[in-house]
C-alpha cells in the first residue's frame, strides 16, 4: 500500500523513534560568518530529492536553523527572515529520526513535540522517510491578531517562503541538498505534532546530504 493510499484512508502515521527522544536539545552557537558569497549561493540554489540517511552534525544543524529562522538582532529580537508586522507567526518544527522538535529561537534550542519518527508524515514522497531532517513550517494564527483574518494565511505563506529560501541558500555552503514540498497530509501531520486549532501546517522542507 502506497503512502498516498494510506493518506486517503486516513492511516498515514508516525513510526517509533529511532532512539531516545531527549526532552530538549541545546544547540551550539551558530556560525555567523563565512560560507559562500551570496551570488555563488544563488547560482548553486537547486532542489534535490536523493538523500543519504546520514544525520547532520549538531553544529551544522545549529547553523542551519539559525540561518533559517534564528535571531540575528538580539537587542530587538528580530529574525533572519521577515514577517508582517513582526508577528513572527511561523513555528519551525524539526523532524529527526529520534523525534519531532520545536525550534526555540530565543534559547537557540529544540524542545520535544513528539517522541516519534514523524518524518514519513511530512510528505507523500518516499525520500522523506529516509532523509535525516524534515522541517515543517506551521503558522500560528493566534500571533497574527494585528493582521486582518482574511489575509493571515497569505501573510504566513510569504514568511514561510522567506524562511525556506534561507535554507536553500545555506544548503550549498554546507554541502547539503534540500527540497521544499507542499504535497502533505496536513491533518495527519497536525495530529502527529499535536498542533492546536490556531496552528496551520503550510509547507515541509527536506534537508540532507545528497546521495548523488
Summary of predicted features, one role per range:
Residues 1-131:
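N-terminal amphipathic, basic helical "cap/leader" segment at the start of enzyme domains
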Residues 45, 64, 92, 133-189:
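Small-aliphatic-rich amphipathic alpha-helix that forms the alpha element of a beta-alpha
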Residues 82-86, 184-191:
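Beta-rich nucleic-acid/ligand-interaction surfaces
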Residues 84, 178-181, 197:
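Short, surface-exposed helix-loop/turn micro-motifs enriched in polar/charged residues
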Residues 97-98, 140, 210:
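Solvent-exposed coil/turn segments that connect beta secondary-structure elements
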Residues 129-133, 198-200:
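Short coil/turn connectors at secondary-structure junctions
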Residues 193-212:
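A glycine-rich helix N-cap at a beta->alpha junction
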Amino acid at each position: 500500500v502506497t503512502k498516498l493510499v494510506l493518506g486517503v484512508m486516513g492511516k498515514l502515521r508516525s513510526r517509533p523513534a529511532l532512539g531516545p527522544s531527549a526532552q530538549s536539545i541545546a544547540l551550539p552557537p551558530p556560525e555567523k560568518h563565512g560560507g559562500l558569497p551570496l551570488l555563488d549561493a544563488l547560482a548553486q540554489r537547486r532542489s534535490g530529492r536523493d538523500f543519504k540517511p546520514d544525520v547532520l552534525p549538531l553544529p551544522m544543524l545549529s547553523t542551519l536553523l539559525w540561518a533559517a529562522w534564528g535571531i540575528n538582532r538580539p537587542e530587538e529580537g528580530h529574525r533572519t527572515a521577515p514577517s508582517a508586522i513582526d508577528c513572527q507567526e511561523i513555528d519551525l518544527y524539526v523532524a529527526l529520526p529520534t523525534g519531532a522538535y520545536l525550534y526555540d529561537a530565543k534559547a537557540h534550542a529544540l524542545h520535544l513535540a513528539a517522541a516519534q519518527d514523524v518524518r514519513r508524515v511530512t510528505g507523500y514522497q518516499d525520500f522523506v522517510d529516509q532523509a535525516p531532517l524534515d522541517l515543517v513550517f506551521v503558522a500560528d494564527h493566534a500571533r497574527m491578531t494585528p493582521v486582518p483574518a482574511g489575509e493571515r494565511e497569505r501573510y504566513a505563506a510569504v514568511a514561510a517562503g522567506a524562511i525556506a529560501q534561507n535554507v536553500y541558500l545555506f544548503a550549498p555552503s554546507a554541502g547539503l541538498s534540500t527540497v521544499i514540498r507542499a504535497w502533505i497530509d496536513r491533518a495527519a501531520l497536525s495530529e502527529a505534532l499535536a498542533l492546536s486549532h490556531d496552528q496551520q501546517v503550510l509547507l515541509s522542507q527536506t534537508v540532507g546530504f545528497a546521495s548523488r
